[in-house]
UniProtKB/Swiss-Prot annotation:
Homodimer. Belongs to the alpha-IPM synthase/homocitrate synthase family. Pathway: Amino-acid biosynthesis; L-isoleucine biosynthesis; 2-oxobutanoate from pyruvate: step 1/3. SMART domains: LeuA_dimer. Its EC number is 2.3.3.21. It catalyses: pyruvate + acetyl-CoA + H2O = (3R)-citramalate + CoA + H(+). It comes from Methanosarcina acetivorans (strain ATCC 35395 / DSM 2834 / JCM 12185 / C2A). Keywords: Amino-acid biosynthesis, Branched-chain amino acid biosynthesis, Isoleucine biosynthesis, Transferase. This is Putative (R)-citramalate synthase CimA. Catalyzes the condensation of pyruvate and acetyl-coenzyme A to form (R)-citramalate.
Amino acid sequence: MRDGEQTPGVALTREKKLLIARALDEMRINVIEAGSAITSAGERESIKAVANAGLDAEICSYCRIVKMDVDHALECDVDSIHLVAPVSDLHIKTKIKKDRDTVRQIAAEVTEYAKDHGLIVELSGEDASRADPEFLKAIYSDGIDAGADRLCFCDTVGLLVPEKTTEIFRDLSSSLKAPISIHCHNDFGLATANTVAALAAGAKQSHVTINGLGERAGNASLEEVVMSLEWLYKYDTGIKHEQIYRTSRLVSRLTGIPVSPNKALVGGNAFTHEAGIHVHGLLADKSTYEPMSPEYIGRQRQIVLGKHAGRSSITLALKEMGLEADEAQTEEIFNRVKQMGDQGKHITDADLQTIAETVLDIYKEPIVKLEEFTIVSGNRVTPTASIKLNVKDKEIVQAGIGNGPVDAVINAIRRAVSSCAEDVVLEEYHVDSITGGTDALVEVRVKLSKNGKVITASGARTDIIMASVEAVMNGMNRLIREE
């Protein structure tokens, strides 16, 4: 958690840390590094809250090789410390302005101090990939003699390659008398590969973050490492893999860092198919164009429509909507979808449903209907929305506040439909101007999810708030109807 929070722009409150820690614990993560106790009094309160939350995981604090850091960690009731000692000459001489012998001595002394105070100690070599191998072994050996429970090799600026990682970890795991961890950064995009290589070569633990968050290019991704071990190496990690996607979305929402659409496993496109030939293959055998079942990590595959869509895509999408079309009707729906795709239009699930219901001459009464809404906003007013909806023939009035008028009205809608659409999450929100000028027609596209199912919907108006309401309502109706 600490490394993930070092992502630029991320600052987690105590409440957010608790939510993430509980989610990680439910996934059966062994060790949670909740933060750095030296940072501030507020950070110590957050770490202590996590440590006292009754979790099964070992709760850890980051510490420098400074006794004061250990004292602050002890204030937080943590089980262990991640004790980090600089081991490359670059870090020793320029960062802390000491020599090798002094660093060895201090690292051993602080390790012994922490052990004397009842802490589990993981002694970490910072910038180990640029360290003298013999000095690295010496500082690790001193740490073991001082009582260190675990060791860690930090590839601090992502300089390792898998072949070198294998060589290093075969040597360290055979020559040292304590389990060793791997901590990789993703500066060259090799963090996951290096982490898996280290584990295959004898490492007993890996430092990872949800969604690969972290400073600069991030850290090794938990979901990628876990699924590589489970699926490619057939190794049972003990992680509850079906909770991976849900936890990924939680972390993205709480940190405000969106997941790249093409991110492995948890990105929006990871199990999304458009091309007709691919969907045709999926209908015959899911493994044709998928390396694993999306349900394994708690999500569902998605078929999207566009200029590359084929008849198989249309057929499958209609089936998921509970609609049946004969050959002629399918052909007409297919032609209309193709025409929209050729015009460069993003075709949402709601668009397809509208096209299909028009061709099939079906009218479905919306389950959730908008009666009216009011927005109050200004530079000295907290944006507030009140909304009246008809939900399953029952009038519901609710209010919501937000960071702006759009956020406020969406929050009001969520509260109003909570009885029949609990756990619906707004995953993405996009606004495009269709025409120019101050009276421009805007299109709002949203992506909503519920229990792993993801749908898209849109609304187009000259009023951005009304377009947003229309898009969310269209999506809500689709999710509720298909439950």
